[in-house]
């Protein structure tokens, strides 16, 4: 490492068969680390590999290793980074800003991500490593009430327009300010951008239309921190 290179924080990353990061929660942690000015040392892990790392302590990702300190869960990681490195750019400038990020996440997940999950759950299955596919099918079909993945995604093209319309409050907010954090991106932006990065990692039926106003924010967000969200393995978000 050169004398001027930023110190890195290790991030255990959930990946597809092609090595592309899939988890929106890992993406949140990745953005949080970069926002604090640290380099990300990503360690790729498959679904079935999670229990094989770190002595089997964790059953889900992200996990960071910051000089021997292990932190699990994207919100806990953000809080840890702000608490441990208060001299670096904050993820939550105030308690109120954190509360608003929680509010946004509580709206965005059931309104946008959960419906998109039902559109892309079969894509998720098809793009994971071969050894992960049985687990993905069994766990997702159980979560979805026993429905076959093929049946869940059927008719998704007809459902996508309603999901796009449900994003309208996000478009309205971003028409008045460059970021959800105002003049600078904050954790709410990372929650939203990470959802679109998840969709870009697996979709075979793009969620957005080419003229969607959200692309101004999405593209600027993907370009942050030296193009953190730019990965040639990602799939288009619009046809």
Predicted feature locations:
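Non-transmembrane alpha-helical segments in soluble domains
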Residues: 78, 82, 102-105, 160, ...
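Acidic carboxylate-rich catalytic motifs and surrounding loops in phosphoryl-/glycosyl-chemistry enzymes
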Residues: 44-49, 185, 234-236
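GST-like domain detector, emphasizing the conserved glutathione-binding G-site
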Residues: 1-134
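GST-like fold's C-terminal all-alpha helical module
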Residues: 110-216
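Long, positively charged, glycine-interspersed low-complexity recognition regions
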Residues: 199-239
